[in-house]
Amino acid sequence: MIERAGKKKMLIFSGSSNPELADKVAKELGTELAEVDKTQFANGEIYIRLQESVRGADCFVMQSHSGQVNFTIMEQLLLVDALKRASAKRITAVLPFYPYSRQDKKALPREPISARLVADLFIAAGADRIVSIDLHTQQIQGFVDQPFDHLTAMPLFVNYFKEKFEEPITIISPDAGGVRRATTFAKNMEAYVGFVHKK
């Protein structure tokens, strides 16, 4: 089928880590997941092939990065690259949990800044925008010049905990670095706040 020039098209693609989440997002937006042929060769290499034309389309590539993180990163990068080479108009890489986010700076000499490398890889692959949720540190947004949307799920958690637990409750940060987030969460919950001091 040949589409009219100028007709807008949005396509949502999912990696293999959490297709259920991507499917729910697609249904909320009144669409279905775009078809992708994903296989793995005997040597572990990933093969990707888009099953429909994406020319001129606004494409979103969703992948949750937990479990086999290195595999899921590579799979999402290949999806982004395939879309770029197939003339997608705009590509948004959606990473609900940003991989390597805790490695956002050098703590010791001769260490990589892995979170920066991940961002660079997605931009190099062809992503026009990155979307993530509740980053470990907000500075990750500054690693790239392209738009980087940092969303928060805090209102959802606040509502859930307010319904689930009776007052008073205390929000504990596992370290000093998380105190700001814990304080914001506690303020929205009208709760106490504390943190664990690591030696």
Feature locations, PLM:
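PRPP-associated nucleotide enzymes
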Residues: 1-199
